[in-house]
């Protein structure tokens, strides 16, 4: 997992509350456990007019040329609700998103996102409103998420955000559960070496 310190990129506004994980990655695409390849199915039922994914929906925001290459998803409250599928953050990351900004996230989704190196930023609802207004009036404007300073910046706007210090440490250093364990490999090995061989 790659560490995250700062990221600046185009923000795409998904102006919907309570976006659930079935909308993020529909159930028919969950057959595999490899994290790669889910991006093409992200928001499938909204992005495409057909089941095969061959006819893009021109009305859906991710299909609009002005948001091409967006790496920040701006969303509304309770993003990632519904079932706890880890495929949802996989799909968002595989599509190219580095960070998500919303006023709230579903708890399980929030943890899954962090565990997969995707940075979910919680701002006050009125701050999210201001970002939506900015992106609407200046399509293609870049937003900067600075995890080292716990700041979101865009144009003249600047907002602080809070994140659990342990989770922040993991994101800054690119550590998932395996990476954290490997940091203590020498200590674990020394402990195991002291144990009787018959245990």
Swiss-Prot record:
Membrane keyword on record:
no
Q: Pathway it acts in?
A: Amino-acid biosynthesis; L-leucine biosynthesis; L-leucine from 3-methyl-2-oxobutanoate: step 2/4
One Pfam family this chain carries? Answer: Aconitase_C
Q: What InterPro entries does its record include?
A: 3-IsopropMal_deHydase_ssu, Aconitase/3IPM_dehydase_swvl, AconitaseA/IPMdHydase_ssu_swvl, IPMI_Swivel, LeuD
CDD domains, sorted: IPMI_Swivel
Which superkingdom is the protein from? Bacteria
Q: Does the keyword Amino-acid biosynthesis apply?
A: yes
Report the GO terms under cellular component: 3-isopropylmalate dehydratase complex
Enumerate the GO terms in the molecular function aspect.
Answer: 3-isopropylmalate dehydratase activity
Q: What does this protein do?
A: Catalyzes the isomerization between 2-isopropylmalate and 3-isopropylmalate, via the formation of 2-isopropylmaleate.
The entry's family comment says: Belongs to the LeuD family. LeuD type 1 subfamily.
Task: Cite the record's note on assembly.
Answer: Heterodimer of LeuC and LeuD.
Q: Can you name this protein?
A: 3-isopropylmalate dehydratase small subunit
Q: What species does this protein belong to?
A: Aeromonas salmonicida (strain A449)
Gene name on record? leuD
């Amino acid at each position: 997992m790659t560490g995250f310190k700062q990221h600046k990129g185009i923000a795409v506004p998904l102006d919907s509350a309570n976006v659930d994980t079935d909308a993020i990655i529909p159930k028919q695409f969950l057959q595999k456990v490899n994290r790669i390849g889910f991006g093409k199915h992200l928001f499938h039922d909204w992005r495409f007019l057909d089941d095969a994914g061959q006819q893009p929906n021109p009305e859906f925001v991710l299909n609009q040329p002005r948001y091409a290459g967006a790496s920040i998803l701006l969303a509304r409250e309770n993003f990632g609700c519904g079932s706890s599928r880890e495929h949802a953050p996989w799909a968002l990351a595989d599509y190219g998103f580095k960070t998500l900004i919303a006023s709230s996230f579903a708890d399980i989704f929030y943890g899954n996102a962090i565990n997969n190196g995707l940075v979910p930023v919680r701002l006050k609802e009125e701050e999210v409103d201001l970002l939506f207004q900015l992106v609407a009036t200046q399509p293609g404007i870049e937003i900067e998420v600075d995890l080292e300073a716990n700041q979101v910046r865009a144009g003249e706007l600047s907002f602080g955000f809070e994140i659990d210090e342990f989770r922040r440490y993991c994101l800054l250093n690119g550590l998932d559960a395996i990476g954290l364990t490997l940091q203590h490999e020498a200590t674990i090995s020394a402990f195991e070496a002291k144990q009787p061989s018959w245990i």
